[in-house]
Every structure is written in structure tokens, then in C-alpha cells.
């Protein structure tokens, strides 16, 4: 019945993802010592994990009322609000937290993701840019900037950001995939094939994705199909991303296709391919005449 005993059990249950059992033990711990804010924070987080968001929001709100600069409480509360699709409320939580940590990468990055889900891409872009300025080693903000610039149809800016991302393992394959798309839009089919081959080598699942997209139709038969080794497909390096990051990537990718400039540029891309082929035919004809 000791505090340490309950806390120890709670930690084990939490690691095993037995959240309801962990919650019981943390609540027993808190009953014995209500001065531990860290335990109350754990209780709030676990309420969120088991789908009792109302209780979670209440607890985290209480903690922030007493201590407005409680960073961990802000991050957990915003995550729960995002999961409930209460994006405007999540934005407010991040904005309040930024008053106390104005140069925090994670706050700007997460705020950018929330603005993305609000379809406020201009503000999302600002937040990702600030995050990228704060920490130049973490590449995912720049990756998102590449996607947003594609959405706006700014191919040069998008290409710049994706080129910066090719050294980062967690977003490398995706960066090459988008570089291949940009090359196709520009009518640079050879460059597109090279980028596509690297993307598929890094992440074999991208082959099927490309095969299903009209933009890659002119080159899909000329890129390398993924090869399976004895141990199966090459490990996808993007596994280091969180579920939230992967969801945002997919969301931006789909948004580009639905409302962005990529679909509009498919026609331009096809025209560029036709022009390139026509130029080749004309050149061949000139050679034959000579």
C-alpha cells in the first residue's frame, strides 16, 4: 500500500499499455500524496488514452490554471483536443504555451500541424518556417514546407525544401517521391525516373503508389520495380515518425491532389512530355534529312 509500490505498478502497467490498470495505481498514488503534480498529469494523460477525454481535459485544465507554463500539460491537452478535432481550442493551448517558451521547436511544429488540419496553410507555413529556423537538424518541418509549397504550386520552393530533406532518413524516400513529381510537372522525365528509382529503393511501397497516379503514367513502365531480398522488403526508414506526423503527411498529400496545384499541373506535365517527345521526333527527322 506504499506510494512507491503503487507508482511502480503503475509504471509497469503503463509500459505494457494496460492503461486502465495503470490509471488505478496512479489514482491510488495520488490519493496518498496529492502534492505530486507529475502523478496528476499522468492521470490526465491516461484518461485521454482510454477515451475519457472529458475527465482528461478537466484535469489538464486544472493543472494549467495553477501553473500556466506547465509545458507537458499543454502538449498533452493539445494532443487530446486534436484527437477530438477541436483544432481551434488546440491552437489556443499552443499559443498560450508559446508565451512561456517562445523558441520551442515542438510547439511551432505541432501548431503547424494543427493549422494544417484547419486547412489554414498560410499560418501552417509560418509555423513550419519558424520551427525550421529554431532547429535546422530536424527535417520534418521542412518536409511539410515542401508539401505546402507544392499545394500552392510554388515548384521551385518545394524542390528546394525536398532537396534539403534527402539527407534525413525519416523523410528521405518521401522527398525523392515528391522530387519525381516535380520533375514530371516540369517535363523532365529522365530526372523524374532517377528520383523515382531512388524513392522506390528506399521505400518499395512507393512503387504501387506511383503506379496508381496519372502523373507517373508516362514513366512507370521504365522505373525499376521493387526487388524482394531474402529478408523481404527494405525497411521503411520513415518508421521513426509518429502516427500524427504520418497522418499529417498523408493529409497534405491528399490535399495537394484534391485542391492543390498538382492536379492542375498534370495537364501541363502531359503537355511538357508531348513537347519533349515531339522535339525528339523533329530532331530525328532532321538527322535523317542530313
What are these regions (language model features)?
Residues 3-4, 37-38, 71-72, 105-106, ...:
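Helix-start (N-cap) detector for alpha-helical repeat units in TPR-like alpha-solenoids
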Residues 15, 49-50, 83-84, 117-118, ...:
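Register position in tetratricopeptide repeats
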Residues 8, 42, 76, 110, ...:
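Canonical tetratricopeptide repeat
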Residues 181-208:
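TPR/TPR-like (Sel1-like) alpha-helical repeat modules
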Amino acid at each position: 500500500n506504499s506510494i512507491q509500490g503503487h507508482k511502480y505498478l503503475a509504471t509497469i502497467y503503463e509500459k505494457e499499455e494496460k492503461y486502465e490498470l495503470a490509471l488505478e495505481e496512479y489514482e491510488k498514488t495520488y490519493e496518498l500524496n496529492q502534492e505530486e503534480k507529475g502523478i496528476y498529469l499522468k492521470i490526465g494523460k491516461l484518461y485521454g488514452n482510454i477515451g475519457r477525454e472529458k475527465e482528461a481535459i478537466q484535469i489538464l485544465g486544472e493543472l494549467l490554471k495553477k501553473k500556466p507554463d506547465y509545458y507537458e500539460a499543454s502538449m498533452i491537452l493539445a494532443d487530446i483536443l486534436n484527437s477530438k478535432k477541436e483544432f481551434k481550442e488546440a491552437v489556443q493551448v499552443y499559443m498560450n504555451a508559446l508565451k512561456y517558451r517562445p523558441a520551442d521547436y515542438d510547439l511551432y511544429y505541432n501548431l503547424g500541424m494543427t493549422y494544417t488540419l484547419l486547412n489554414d496553410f498560410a499560418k501552417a507555413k509560418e509555423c513550419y518556417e519558424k520551427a525550421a529556423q529554431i532547429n535546422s537538424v530536424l527535417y520534418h518541418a521542412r518536409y511539410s514546407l515542401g508539401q505546402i509549397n507544392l499545394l500552392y504550386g510554388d515548384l521551385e520552393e518545394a524542390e528546394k525544401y525536398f532537396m534539403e530533406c534527402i539527407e534525413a532518413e525519416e523523410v528521405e524516400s518521401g522527398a525523392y517521391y515528391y522530387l519525381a513529381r516535380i520533375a514530371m510537372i516540369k517535363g523532365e522525365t529522365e530526372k523524374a525516373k532517377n528520383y523515382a528509382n531512388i524513392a522506390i529503393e528506399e521505400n518499395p511501397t512507393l512503387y504501387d503508389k506511383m503506379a496508381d497516379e496519372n502523373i507517373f503514367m508516362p514513366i512507370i513502365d521504365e522505373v525499376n520495380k521493387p526487388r524482394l531480398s531474402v529478408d523481404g522488403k527494405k525497411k521503411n526508414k520513415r518508421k521513426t515518425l509518429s502516427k500524427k506526423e504520418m497522418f499529417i503527411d498523408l493529409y497534405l498529400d491528399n490535399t495537394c491532389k484534391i485542391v492543390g496545384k498538382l492536379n492542375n499541373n498534370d495537364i501541363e506535365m502531359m503537355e511538357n512530355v508531348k513537347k519533349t517527345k515531339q522535339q525528339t521526333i523533329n530532331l530525328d527527322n532532321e538527322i535523317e534529312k542530313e
